[in-house]
Design a protein with these regions (language model features):
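Glycine-rich dinucleotide-binding loop and its adjacent helix/turn
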Residues: 4, 86-89, 99-106, 112, ...
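N-terminal Rossmann-like FAD-binding beta1-loop-alpha1 element of flavoenzymes
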Residues: 5-40, 217-224
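Glycine-rich FAD pyrophosphate-binding loop
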Residues: 16-18, 32-59, 227-241
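Rossmann-like dinucleotide/flavin-binding elements
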Residues: 18, 32-33, 196-238, 294, ...
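Glycine-rich active-site loop/strand segments that organize a redox cofactor
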Residues: 43-109, 133, 314-319, 352, ...
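Feature captures the FAD/FMN-dependent oxidoreductase FAD-binding
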Residues: 93-165, 170, 174
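A Rossmann-like FAD-binding core segment of flavoenzymes
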Residues: 128, 145, 161, 222-307, ...
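C-terminal, flexible cofactor-proximal segment of oxidoreductases
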Residues: 311, 323-454
């Protein structure tokens, strides 16, 4: 809702953004646009979040889940922010589905173009975020202030600051989710999550079991078959894509299995159909969990089986909004434009330009959303999997943000269909030329055409 009193109540707030990845950068820009004073705390040495590749996985904490050969699963045309398209650059990766480094460079370009770097404190880990004085919390109290404790990597001192608002933009690819398998704790050979997978060479001549049939699981399996003795892909469902079926038929050392039943101390991995293999390594491509170890909301915001809640529109805790908000929680959507719409809403709420519904209305909305997911049979851990263009458009309507362009939706669907049918080749061979031309002739690209090869 637009506030009638905006002219009288507009004000600048001190806002802390946690994370300088795609969602954090979007938040920082929109907050500053709205006149707020912004500090971004980033634990890495540069911007990019997950897209800042780190080949070193021997350290205690690994922040990036990107492996060396990773390429985008969506075409570059749909990946950019709405007013800063992901265009080709001379001397760089000009493929439609470029490698991870190109997206990281795009984020650096975005940061430079809008002067965001001056707001960011790098190599700074957030240790604690909590309410300054909880006292008797008033529902919807916009006077809540937040204590943020942070520590620079090479410093001994913890810095304590107070902010009017905190935006959590830490992403959802940092905390590996592992399955619960009988005998897992006694299986003495190598077990690892794809979070720390980087290159296939360490698996040369090994028998590897890959758990999880996601795109990352499939990509890593296709990479491993070139060096491993055998690769056994364990999937929840026997119904696999045409593309994966083609890959399996092509490689004699790639085998499909159902879920794992148990692991045995002698190295055997037994599947639910009774088949078994003796493996050297189990590689879990089983996704990630939401985790905010620094955040203390006195139990108001909790993570329950990967459901972060209660959150109104996946963004606002009704009891703490707008002083606490989250950007980048939803999955399975076209991320960059959605991050922007979230960031704009947050920034305008904090300046008084807009208002949220009442606490009762927000909580009712959350309950209705949970109920709709339950009725549809969607597990709780998939609460934030959106996969719905209409939802993104309805969200945008809340702040007058443009709907996703039809070409953007079409290119997204086309890539999904093509990857399903042609898993090995979809990034380099496609038939969406008409949609591509529509995209390149749209204002999204033509408005910055002159800068395409800066």
């Amino acid at each position: 809702m637009v506030s009638d009193d905006h002219q009288q109540c507009a004000q600048s707030k001190n806002v802390c953004v946690i994370g300088a990845g795609p969602s954090g950068l979007a938040a920082a820009r929109e907050l500053r646009k709205e006149g707020h004073r912004v500090v971004v705390l980033e634990q890495n040495h540069d911007v990019g979040g997950q897209w800042l590749y780190d080949p070193n996985t021997d350290q205690t904490e690994v922040h990036s889940s990107v492996y060396a050969s990773l390429r985008l699963t969506s075409p570059r045309e749909i990946m950019g922010y709405t007013d800063f398209p992901f265009v080709l650059k001379k001397g760089r990766d000009v493929r439609r589905f470029p490698g991870h480094k190109e997206l990281w460079l795009y984020l650096k370009d975005f940061c430079q173009r809008f002067g965001l770097r001056e707001m960011i404190r790098f190599n700074t880990r957030v240790e604690y975020v909590g309410m300054l004085d909880c006292g008797e919390l008033i529902i919807g109290n916009d006077l809540i202030k937040w204590v943020v404790k942070s520590k620079e990597k090479k410093a001994d001192k913890v810095v304590e600051e107070v902010f009017d608002a905190v935006v959590v933009a830490t992403g959802h690819y940092s905390y590996p989710r592992l399955p619960s398998i009988k005998g897992m704790d006694k299986w003495k050979r190598k077990q690892m999550h794809s979070h720390i997978y980087r290159v296939p060479e360490p698996f040369r001549n090994e028998v590897v079991v890959v758990v999880g049939n996601s795109l990352s699981g499939q990509d890593i399996s296709m990479e491993l078959v070139e060096v491993a003795k055998e690769v056994h892909l364990s999937a929840k469902s026997p119904n696999i894509s045409e593309g994966l079926s083609k890959v399996i038929s092509k490689h004699n050392n790639l085998h499909l299995h159902p879920q794992i039943d148990c692991l045995r101390e002698d190295g055997r991995v037994t599947f639910v159909d009774g088949c078994w293999v003796t493996a050297d390594t189990i590689l879990y491509c089983t996704g990630y969990s939401y985790s905010f170890p620094f955040l203390d909301t006195k139990g108001i915001v909790v993570v329950d089986d990967d459901r972060v809640g209660p959150l109104y529109e996946h963004t606002f805790p009704p009891s703490l909004a707008p002083s606490l908000s989250f950007v980048g929680i939803p999955r399975k959507l076209i991320g960059f434009p959605f991050f922007e719409s979230q960031a704009k809403w947050i920034a305008q709420l904090l300046s008084g330009k807009r208002t949220l519904p009442s606490w009762d209305q927000m909580m009712q909305s959350v309950k209705e959303f949970y109920h709709s997911r339950d009725v549809a049979g969607i597990p709780k851990h998939n609460t934030h999997d959106i996969a719905n263009f209409e939802y993104c458009d309805r969200y945008a309507d809340q702040i007058g943000f443009p709907h996703l362009e039809e070409w953007r939706k079409g290119l997204c669907i086309s890539a999904l269909v093509n990857s399903d049918a042609n898993l090995e080749t979809y990034r380099d061979s496609w038939d969406d030329h008409e949609l591509l031309q529509e995209a390149l002739q749209s204002p999204h690209f033509t408005q910055l055409n002159a800068q395409a090869f800066d």
